[in-house]
Regions:
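Active-site recognition of the HExxH zinc-binding catalytic motif
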Residues: 208-225
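An active-site-proximal "capping" alpha-helix that borders the catalytic cofactor pocket
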Residues: 248-264
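Post-HEXXH active-site segment of zinc metalloproteases
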Residues: 221-252
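Short, charged/polar micro-motifs that form catalytic or ligand-binding hotspots
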Residues: 86, 200-212, 241-249
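N-terminal low-structure segments adjacent to metalloprotease catalytic domains
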Residues: 1-125, 197, 350
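Basic, amphipathic N-terminal segments that precede the first structured/catalytic domain
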Residues: 97-147, 155-156, 164-169, 173, ...
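Long, well-structured alpha-helical subdomains associated
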Residues: 55-58, 64, 260-350
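Active-site scaffold of zinc-dependent metalloenzymes
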Residues: 129, 139-207
């Protein structure tokens, strides 16, 4: 039996779990974002290059078929993963990766934003043991879900998905091209020769962003150590609420204050800084208007002083706010969402 034949049941099981997750959670996107992501999912599944024009009729037919298929599997449980005669829990990434080591593959199964399960199986491009975590970088992806987050910290592992990062960048480019606004994304794209050599530019952007993504995920690991297990328990109390979005944004800001902002300032690469601000979510910007103002100051003057002054202050702010949020949860974990929203809203960093 060839390795491809041996691993086909695993590939099918991982992709099935991806489909089940999509069936349950794809509807959480706005219509515009959903359609954009589905077009790029079609591109990946059918093997089209980024610059290829997609056949709209085929995309439409595929979309209808996929949504009908989702209806048939939405209530299925996630499948166990078969590897070398054994079966593994799809969320036990450590055990699955130990079994996959001899095949040169990497797997991840975990929960992302809004408790959405994410799974992927890909070619292991790089594995590195650091002092406080293991870095696993995947190349080609053989199974993935609609969202395909480009990075995730799970336990003592940081997974970076190079192909998903490239696709995320491409989605951002396509989205920006609709309006061509003079914003952080537009400034980041101007650094690269996108119009004349899109593939080379995309590779260069991916190399640039991998360092930034790793900085954030390292910050996530450190933030998790500081916040402890009660943070995830608190998050589990407020699923699908504004409070959940705020809890995630506060942790993101804490992680970035620990590693991302200091690392970006030390690297002094304009493209990396622009990409970072282009990737900030609406809630992150709402909670940290001082950071947006510092970025605007840097853009106008070329002097990063405002960001440099803000970085150490932000760590103290988000650490203290996170502590107060945990106190609320520990004092009374019931009816938590409204109290968290009120606390965080009153603690914006302006």
């Amino acid at each position: 039996m060839s390795m491809q034949d041996e691993l086909q049941p695993l590939l099918s099981a991982v992709q099935r779990n991806c489909h089940i997750s999509d069936a349950r959670y794809a509807g959480n996107y706005s219509l515009c974002v959903y359609l954009l992501k589905m077009r790029e999912y079609f591109r990946w599944e059918k093997g089209y290059a980024f610059r290829d024009n997609l056949p709209d009729g085929d995309v439409g037919d595929w979309l209808k078929e996929r949504e009908l298929f989702w209806q048939t599997i939405e209530d299925e449980p996630f499948a166990e993963l078969p590897v070398a005669g054994d079966h593994y829990d799809p969320f036990d990434s450590d055990a699955v990766n130990a079994a996959l080591a001899r095949y040169g593959l990497v797997y991840s199964g975990g929960l992302g934003s809004k408790g959405t399960p994410h799974f992927f199986l890909g070619k292991l491009g790089h594995r590195e043991q650091r002092s406080d975590f293991t870095l696993l970088v995947s190349e080609n992806e053989y199974a993935r879900d609609l969202t395909a987050p480009p990075a995730m910290a799970l336990g003592g592992n940081i997974f970076i998905r190079r192909e998903s990062l490239r696709r995320m960048i491409w989605e951002k480019i396509e989205e920006w091209r609709w309006h061509r606004l003079e914003n952080a994304m537009g400034r980041a794209l101007r650094v690269f020769d996108l119009e004349n050599n899109a593939e080379a530019a995309l590779e260069e952007m991916t190399d640039t962003l991998i360092d930034s993504v790793l900085l954030h995920e390292k910050g996530e690991v450190l933030a998790g150590e500081r916040l402890g297990p009660d943070w995830e328990r608190m998050l589990g109390r407020v699923p699908g609420t504004k409070a959940e979005i705020m809890v995630r944004a506060v942790r993101d800001h804490l992680a970035d204050s620990l590693t991302t902002l200091p690392g970006l300032l030390a690297a002094a690469k304009d493209a990396s800084m622009h990409f970072y601000f282009a990737s900030l979510g609406n809630m992150q910007k709402h909670l940290f208007p001082a950071l947006v103002q510092a970025y605007d100051s840097w853009v106008a003057s070329g002097d990063p002083g405002a960001i440099e002054q803000l970085a150490p202050r932000s760590e103290a702010h988000w650490q203290a706010l996170a502590g107060r949020m945990l106190e609320l949860y520990r004092h009374d974990p019931d009816d938590l969402a409204e109290r968290l929203v009120a606390l965080v809203e009153s603690s914006r960093f302006e």
